[in-house]
């Protein structure tokens, strides 16, 4: 069908679909929402040719072949037609025309690659003389798992193979790379520089059970499980540890500071919800849900109940009744977009949308009106904004939606440039004022240079923490961190400030450049209760049952 009746709730969204998709008899479409995306479901293998006299029977199932947004941009999935990976997604084309290749491997290919790696290592004079330390890597995986059949196919790398903005640039390395254990579990993730950024360890006796994980440059977190596979302990180096105890519809969580929380649950499967929470200070909060698992009421630690009224069909929030009886009401249009909010004092804010469902006008509760203008019916982002006093600012974007130029109310224009990774490499302001940015292979900002050639440089740790800033005159300021990435000292101009933390990551002491100290104390809910200043004076804080500061 080329067109839907104009009164149909999906009529506008239907027009956003490519004509070939709308007219195809072999494609199913499913709308995620009245303003959102179409999910395109096609044949799992080949599509019958138009001239086939007796086309084959329709398939028993359909696979996701694309996602079309409300402006006609398509995210297309390309699947392997043959081989061991037949039917698997091996390519993606995004709405801007960029093409990505998903490199897949089988268990046998990974095993062969490891054998070649071992052979090369053994033949190298500097390599080990025995491979006995390496565990066996089988050519196949067990056919059946508790999640179904495992064909052993895994994602090895993601490559950007074509970028319309940079058609002549060919990739030399993948955007991301993945390695796996002999059991097919994800072992490590590498970024485009080849640096490992994530690592995982698994239980040798329980396939797929993760027992440790870490980020680059950060300490490892480890997990222990009970006989049913539930986590019973999480151990975090240089941080808080947690113990988990499971009862009937109850989970008790105790940290290494001996703080205890209890979560009480109701429901089963995907509808299980936390209906009561006992906090470390003994206070209790409650939550209520409807049959669909949607939040309908909450009671705070002081016993005050807030009620959410939901639309029976859409589930949209229509009103909130506050503990004192005051009500906030919400209105929607036929596309289920928020159009109004009426506050307890009678004031009202409102929104208007254009035919494409884009925000066109917003009136605040004090009467100020902001308007948005778009360059074309297929633009999802505004090209101009007019504020409450009639001042207009213009915005130009590149094909990827990034800000390319901004013109303020006086006509002053600022222009922006980006590299192929989407990183901002230049900002050009009026009168020749420009800033140029440099990045390393991991995408971290390493330098900024102005139009006069004055450069500021930046250095980082393996974890990505900024460790040094070198100004154009050569002066160097440094920041030191603990293993968890928290700054423990800042040195600038030969003077140092330092910070100390407790196991929960709360700052407990500040030492300034002349050695004076400021100390901090907290309660079991991490609220600041006492501060001893650099001058030696002490200030204390008290809170209500709901966490509001009531005395200082």
Cite the ranges covered by each PLM segment.
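Extended charged/polar low-complexity repeat regions
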Residues: 1-552
């Amino acid at each position: 069908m080329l067109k839907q009746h104009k009164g149909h709730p999906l009529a506008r969204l239907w027009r956003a679909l490519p004509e070939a998709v709308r007219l195809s008899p072999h494609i199913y479409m499913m709308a995620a929402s009245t303003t959102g995306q179409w999910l395109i479901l096609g044949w799992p293998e080949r599509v019958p040719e138009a001239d086939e006299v007796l086309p084959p029977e329709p398939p028993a199932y359909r696979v996701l072949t694309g996602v079309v947004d409300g402006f006609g941009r398509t995210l297309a999935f390309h699947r392997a037609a043959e081989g061991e990976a037949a039917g698997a997604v091996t390519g993606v084309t995004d709405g801007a025309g960029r093409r990505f290749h998903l490199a897949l491997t089988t268990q046998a290919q990974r095993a062969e690659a490891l054998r070649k790696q071992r052979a090369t290592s053994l033949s190298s004079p500097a390599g080990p003389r025995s491979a006995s330390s390496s565990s066996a890597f089988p050519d196949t995986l067990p056919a059946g798992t508790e999640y179904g059949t495992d064909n052993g196919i895994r994602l090895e790398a993601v490559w950007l193979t074509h970028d319309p903005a940079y058609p002549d640039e060919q990739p030399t390395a993948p955007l991301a790379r993945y390695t796996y254990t002999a059991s097919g579990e994800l072992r490590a993730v590498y970024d485009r520089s080849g640096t490992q950024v994530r690592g995982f360890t698994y239980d040798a006796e329980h396939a797929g059970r993760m027992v440790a994980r870490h980020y680059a440059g950060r300490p490892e977190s480890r997990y222990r499980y009970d006989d049913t596979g539930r986590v019973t302990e999480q151990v975090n180096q240089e941080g808080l540890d947690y113990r988990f105890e499971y009862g009937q519809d109850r989970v008790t969580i105790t940290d290494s500071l001996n703080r205890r929380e209890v979560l009480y649950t109701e429901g089963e499967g995907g509808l299980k919800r936390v209906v009561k929470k006992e906090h470390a200070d003994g206070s209790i909060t409650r939550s209520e849900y409807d049959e669909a698992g949607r939040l309908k009421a909450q009671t705070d630690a002081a016993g005050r109940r807030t009620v959410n009224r939901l639309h029976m069909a859409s589930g949209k929030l229509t009103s909130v009744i506050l503990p004192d009886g005051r009500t906030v009401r919400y209105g929607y249009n036929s596309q289920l977009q928020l159009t109004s909010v009426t506050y307890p004092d009678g004031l009202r804010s409102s929104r208007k949308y254009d035919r494409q469902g884009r925000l066109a006008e917003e009136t605040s509760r004090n009467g100020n009106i902001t308007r948005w203008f778009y360059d074309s019916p297929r633009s999802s982002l505004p090209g101009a904004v007019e504020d409450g006093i009639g001042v207009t600012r213009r915005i130009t974007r590149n094909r990827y939606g990034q800000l390319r130029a901004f013109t303020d109310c006086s006509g002053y224009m600022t222009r922006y440039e980006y590299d192929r990774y989407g990183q901002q490499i230049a900002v050009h302001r009026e009168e020749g004022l420009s800033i140029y940015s440099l990045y390393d292979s991991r995408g971290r900002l390493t330098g900024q240079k102005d139009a006069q050639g004055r450069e500021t440089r930046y250095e980082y740790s393996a974890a990505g923490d900024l460790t040094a800033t070198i100004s154009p005159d050569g002066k160097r300021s440094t920041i030191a961190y603990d293993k968890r990435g928290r700054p423990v000292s800042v040195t600038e101009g030969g003077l140092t400030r330092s910070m100390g933390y407790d196991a929960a990551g709360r700052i407990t002491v500040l030492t300034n450049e002349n050695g004076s100290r400021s100390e901090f104390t907290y309660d079991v809910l991490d609220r600041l209760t006492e501060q001893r200043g650099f001058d030696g004076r002490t200030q204390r804080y008290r809170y209500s049952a709901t966490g509001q500061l009531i005395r200082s």
